[in-house]
Amino acid sequence: LSRRQRQMCIRDSSGSSGRGNLVMNRYSLKEHKWSRVQDVLIDGENKRNAYWQLYVDEQGTIHLSWVWRETWQVETNHDICYARSFDNGVTWYKSSGEQYELPIKLSNAEYACRLPQNSELINQTSMSADAGGNPYIATYWRDPDSNIPQYRIVWNDGKVWHHRQVTDRKTPFTLKGGGTKMIPIARPRIVVGGGEVFYIFRDEERGSCVSIAHATDLAISQWTITDLTDFSVDAWEP
């Protein structure tokens, strides 16, 4: 909700998992009606779809990130992409300042982090931004030489993208297969402010309690992890 323009923007997906588009609609509180911002914001080209998350910062900038999925199977998730808008979703830009030619597709998307399929890359996690408008993305995936997914942070410092590992987990698991799966960790949440990063998660290795990782310098990636509860929250996600 934009207080200045008194409007609400809603994103919706058309199509199905592995084959769909992302569209944006706007509701005017003054006129009491909906309008379409653009017919297609992210185009799956009838081959894939974007699983997305967004964050609106203090300046009103909309930060949007997503992974591509090639089929309905979660193991076909790949890559982390990024776009941002300064005008409530009408025009979109890369972190470099280059304006997107809409719709955004596989070929013209900005890639914050390149990851292949079968990386145990999770979809629909969380984002934040610092006072300078730099985006931060919380997620998890596994390295090619490991079968253990690790929590990660992906961020842009105003010039280039970086990523760091947050945890040192020991338990392997896979996202492969259909249906609802009982996986040992939750999708993470992230909060950024005053040069500090707070990363909220749940992990069976820590008794499935609510845990928070804290860092003050992502360049050296030293994290202090504290359990916020002394009891299990089962399959809770932040």
Predicted regions and their residues:
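Asp-box/BNR beta-propeller loop motif
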Residues: 27-36, 85-96, 154-163, 170, ...
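Structural motif
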Residues: 18-26, 72-81, 145-152, 203-215
